[in-house]
Curated annotation (Swiss-Prot):
Name assigned to this protein: Putative nickel-responsive regulator
Function: Transcriptional regulator.
GO biological process: response to nickel cation
Cofactor annotation remark: Binds 1 nickel ion per subunit.
HAMAP family listed in its UniProt record: NikR
GO molecular function, a single term: nickel cation binding
Chain sites annotated for binding Ni(2+): 79, 90, 92, 98
CDD domains: RHH_NikR_HicB-like (cd22231)
The entry's keywords: DNA-binding, Metal-binding, Nickel, Transcription, Transcription regulation
Family: Belongs to the transcriptional regulatory CopG/NikR family.
Length: 139
């Protein structure tokens, strides 16, 4: 980690009040930590947009396991990407619906492609990709 540098920020007083409320709601110790977190979040988002850096994402799927061949199709997709899908959690939500959470690691563009393939399988009721970082290069 590098040397800490102090700098000033100018902003509208109403925006600052809004920011201070956000800091309190999120439980940050101070403005500096909140600003550092915002910068990190922007950096991670930029890495995902560029698509070349390695990242990690969770793909959450909700589906009715009674839909013909759906479970098999999802399993086939997961096996096709066994090098990138590093973990899977399967939960029976009720007598019909299942939740799967898959942890996918790889280049950001590949993680997004795999998520799109899984979410796009006919019969998936809801799917969502949440993207994050491996932490490498993030200060």
């Amino acid at each position: 980690m590098g040397e800490t540098v102090r700098f000033g920020i100018s902003m509208d007083d109403q925006l600052l009040e809004s920011f201070d409320r956000l800091i309190e709601q999120k439980g940050y110790a101070n403005r500096s930590e909140a600003i550092r977190d915002l910068i990190r979040a922007a950096q991670v988002e930029l890495d995902w947009e560029e698509g070349e850096k390695e990242g990690v994402g969770t793909v959450t799927l909700v589906y009715n396991h009674h839909v013909r061949d759906l479970s098999d199709k999802l399993t086939e997709q997961q096996h096709a990407h066994h090098d990138q899908i590093i973990s899977a959690l399967h939960v029976h939500l009720d007598a019909h619906n299942c939740l799967e959470v898959l942890v996918v690691r790889g280049k950001a563009r590949d993680v997004r492609r795999i998520a799109d393939e899984l979410i796009g399988v006919k019969g998936v009721k809801h799917g969502k990709l949440v993207m994050t970082t491996t932490g490498e290069g993030l200060h």
